[in-house]
Structure formats: structure tokens, C-alpha cells
Amino acid sequence: ANMTTLTYQLSRSLAHRFAPGDEIIISRMEHEGNVSPWLQMAQDRDLTVRWLDFDRDSWCVEPESLKPLLNERTKLLALNYASNMTGGVNDVKALASLAREAGALVYVDAVQFASHRLIDVKDLGVDFLACSPYKYFGPHLGVVYGRRDLLESLHAYKLRCASEDLPYRFSVG
């Protein structure tokens, strides 16, 4: 599966953690693969979507712009590491820290960033980070890092699975 498909699969699995009236935040500089899965989840679960703007000078999401959107109902922040539109590189560590302090999960699309620098997901403090190896000379598929405790707690929606053990739980066939 590609990054978009994996994000969609995880959005389906994560949806049951959220209740009507909960909020998710999506950055306005996202690739569609990190927007539609969350919008469908929000529609299905009656969630409120809050949009996080980016700075028109830096072409990045500034941590200060995230603070007013966070509250006790915030359950997820979806943002990219680097924009496919502007080339802006977000301070994911700072943004993730703010979101996690509010009790929200953090899902990062690193497709445009992964080929340029090493990524330490634990240092960033993200819950999920998705990328596509074809951007750095690998096969055309998606890869998602997920915190083990979260992945173990999720039900995988699929037709048939090779195994319930990680990482195969989210694979078909």
C-alpha cells in the first residue's frame, strides 16, 4: 500500500478512539493523502475539524499558530514535515510537543522530507510518521512508523491478514 492508503487504514482504526464533538486539527499545507482520510473519519464520527494555517512569509506552520486551536477536545494533529507545495519545513518537534501536551495524537506526513534528512521519530515525539520509499529510490509503497503501544491497541480493518502480529497486522494476504 502507498502512504495515502496506509493513512486511510490507520484513520479507520483510530476512529473508534474518538467521540462526537472531539476535534482534530489538519494543517492547510497538507497533501491530499493527509487530508481526506481525516475528513472522512471526522464525518463518520461527528468530529469537529479545525484548520491550522501556515505563515505566508516562512511558508511553515508556526507553533504559535497551533496554540489557540488546542483544547481538551483536541484528539489529533495531522501535519506534514515538509510541504510539497511550498518546500517549507515545519518544526515538527515543537508542534508535536504542543499537541501531545494537550493530549492529542500526532500524525506526520514525511513523504517530502524523508529523502533529505534522517528522522528520529522518538526524538520528535510523534505517534505516527508516514513516508514513501520511492522518494528515496525505494519501491513505490508506503511506510508508517507507529508507537508500538498504539499499534497494538488498534484493530486493523482488512479483508484478510497474514498475521495479527506487528508489523503484519495491517497487511492483507
What are these regions (language model features)?
Residues 1-173:
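Pyridoxal 5′-phosphate
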